From Swiss-Prot:
Gene: rplN
Protein role: Binds to 23S rRNA. Forms part of two intersubunit bridges in the 70S ribosome.
Origin organism lineage: Bacteria, Pseudomonadati, Myxococcota, Myxococcia, Myxococcales
Extent of the signal sequence: none
Protein name: Large ribosomal subunit protein uL14
Matching PANTHER family: 50S/60S RIBOSOMAL PROTEIN L14/L23, LARGE RIBOSOMAL SUBUNIT PROTEIN UL14M
Length: 122
């Protein structure tokens, strides 16, 4: 469960390391985002000579959360940290690699490029 002011790790090689959630997209009164949701973020930490710089505003899709997410078969999945992947206006990832596992819920949200780049889908 991600809300405004949440700090997330970045799970791609776009150059950003930490991002700060400034808006949850999907309705004016929406407070929380979960796996597969798109948020607006500000880059708080970035590597030098990278595609994104500190202070840049971008969109990101959440790929891992500490909060458990229920599945239709009754099982739950949760991760050790909150992570996101930066995306462009066409909903394609900015980076060319994804680090760590991602949740299967991204497939239902049509983020196939992220699914194909991820080393493991749980």
């Amino acid at each position: 469960m991600i809300q405004m002011t949440s700090v997330l790790d970045v799970a791609d090689n776009s150059g950003a390391k930490k991002v700060f959630c400034i808006k949850v997209l999907g309705g004016s009164k929406r407070k929380y985002a979960s796996i597969g949701d798109v948020i607006v973020v500000s880059v708080r930490e970035a590597l030098p000579n990278s595609k994104v710089k500190k202070g840049d505003v971008a969109k990101a899709v959440i790929v891992r959360t500490k909060r458990e997410v229920g599945r239709p078969d009754g099982s739950y999945i949760k991760f050790d940290g909150n992570s996101a992947v930066l995306i462009n206006k066409d909903m394609e990832p900015i980076g060319t690699r994804i680090f760590g596992p991602v949740a299967r819920e991204l497939r239902a949200r049509k983020f196939m490029k992220i699914i194909s780049l991820a080393p493991e889908v749980l």
